Amino acid sequence: MSNIAKGLEGVLFTESKLTFINGSEGILTHLGIPIQEWAEKSTFEELSLALLDAKLPTAEELAKFDAELKANRAIPDQLVGIIRDMPKGVHPMQALRTAVSYLGLLDPQAEDITPEARRAISTRMIAQFSTIIAAINRAQEGQDIVAPRADLTHAGNFLYMLTGNEPTPEQARLFDIALVLHADHGMNASTFTAIATSSTLSDMYSCMVSAIGALKGPLHGGANEAVMTMLDEIGTVDKAEAYITGKLDNKEKIMGVGHRVYKYFDPRSRVLRDYAEHVANKEGKSNYYQILEAIEKIIVDRMGAKGIYPNVDFYSGTVYSDLGIKKEYFTPIFALARISGWCASVIEYSQDNRLLRPDAEYTGARDQHYVDIKDRQ
């Protein structure tokens, strides 16, 4: 029997200049620059442009890109109507998937797969994802949809459209950092799905709808939502040890812990942990953070030797919650950030495209003959 790489783990199918991960040492870089530096010194707008062009932009290039994003934030009235008419209680990821597909119907450039068109569509989608997600949330709540503002950052504008209130500079910066941390992460399931769709020479909207479908699955997106559910079940910090110990003793999964790639601390979780502590203390919402701190200590003590540590989802939910974001929208916000990585990866792969066509080891019957249905047992 051939060697089968279940889940394609460790299989190399292409080259990339965008993102490097060393899971055993907890290293994540974009264009060779550590994620910690991107989070501390950059913005989501700059990282998005850097990923799309696979290079650090100049000040002029960044200013032009920022202006393009702001100019393309508004979504067509037809799409606003579709979002308003969606059934109440629909899963936000279903709504996002439908909205992006419909957006493609309205774009006269949608079927153009030239490099120039892919790049232009990517810019528009990065700008419009935030407007779509905020509009879905408002419509589902029966509230008026808030139009985007061109005087706010990408992160600040999203929070404004979501809540109807202009965020403080600190809130906008915190959310910006969260977007930076989630913008790209190598060949994860959704990025691979987008590339697989692109490899057939399909359009950018189909690639992004494919990626959204992959991200919707609970084994990819949704872990930070599950972390918040776990925190609510625990309730108070004094109950954390018994809860987690019981889960571990029964070999049950702890949400936000462990990673397919990282066998050490997820570097993104270390960045978010510091910000989560700061915001929790400032906003007087330290209960969640105290529970997470207690859980982390137990996990590191009992599971660290096995390479199991908190991942980025462990703290991101509390950050989003403290910003007033409901947990059902944590995964759409993942897409809001990852759209940059999806688009950049599709653009990069398209430069030397080859149709993805893996194989499977056949394990079924051989040398059989058709049996008439009346003679079958």
From Swiss-Prot:
GO molecular function (one): citrate (Si)-synthase activity
Keyword Protease: no
InterPro entries: 2-MeCitrate/Citrate_synth_II, Citrate_synth-like_lrg_a-sub, Citrate_synth-like_sm_a-sub, Citrate_synthase, Citrate_synthase_AS, Citrate_synthase_bac-typ, Citrate_synthase_sf
Pathway membership, UniProt: Carbohydrate metabolism; tricarboxylic acid cycle; isocitrate from oxaloacetate: step 1/2
Top-level taxon: Bacteria
Enzyme Commission no: 2.3.3.16
Active site location: 220, 259, 313
Keyword line: Allosteric enzyme, Transferase, Tricarboxylic acid cycle
Alphabetized PROSITE patterns for the sequence: CITRATE_SYNTHASE
GO cellular component: cytoplasm
Pfam families: Citrate_synt
Function summary: Might regulate the synthesis and function of enzymes involved in later enzymatic steps of Krebs cycle. Loss in activity results in sporulation defect.
Family: Belongs to the citrate synthase family.
PANTHER family, sorted: CITRATE SYNTHASE, CITRATE SYNTHASE, PEROXISOMAL
Subunit and interaction comment: Homodimer.
Protein name as annotated: Citrate synthase
Organism (species): Deinococcus radiodurans (strain ATCC 13939 / DSM 20539 / JCM 16871 / CCUG 27074 / LMG 4051 / NBRC 15346 / NCIMB 9279 / VKM B-1422 / R1)
